[in-house]
């Protein structure tokens, strides 16, 4: 029985390590007793990936600012479109002045020069590995026309997945009123991501 833990993390969480850091998988015996994990978090959830059974939780439905865990949904939407053919890996994406990182210490960035382009696949890597806010915003604009419209797409996907305590306002996770998620919802998103990536040969190659 595979299990996934979704704890609550801080603003500076690097999405490039979310599989290892925010969702650490472990194998447990089907009949073994599950002890409540001792985690220094205000919210977490431990689920069986195969069945969705909740093995342990604390404030799992309580919304909180998801910070860079937001980029899980951003990258999920990009990967969906790559698999459907709506996006191509080598498709150029413009780094607009609005998306461009200006070197602020408050942001994690890929640092693509302003008014230049980078391929979709490089932008995706910049989002996942570097937690790039610039890459996230550029891809949001490329797909949705604006980050606001892309956030609407994020919320549509969240509804499909069954994320009932989540609302996205942007593609980066930067603090914004109304931008929230729960550990329970992020577990559902993690399941969707794993299902998408591990049932696709093309995604496996990436």
Regions found by a protein language model. Name each.
Residues 1-4, 60:
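Extended hydrophobic/aromatic-rich secondary-structure runs
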Residues 3-15:
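Bacterial N-terminal signal peptides that target proteins for export
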Residues 7, 195-196:
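Polar helix-capping/helix-linker motif
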Residues 8-9, 68, 203:
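Short alpha-helical segments used as structural interaction elements across diverse proteins
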Residues 15-19, 23:
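Hydrophobic helical h-region of N-terminal Sec-dependent signal peptides
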Residues 22-30:
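C-terminal segment of classical bacterial N-terminal signal peptides
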Residues 30-184, 188, 193-195:
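Active-site-adjacent loops and short helices of periplasmic peptidoglycan-processing enzymes
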Residues 198-205:
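Conserved small/polar residues in nucleotide/adenosyl-binding loops
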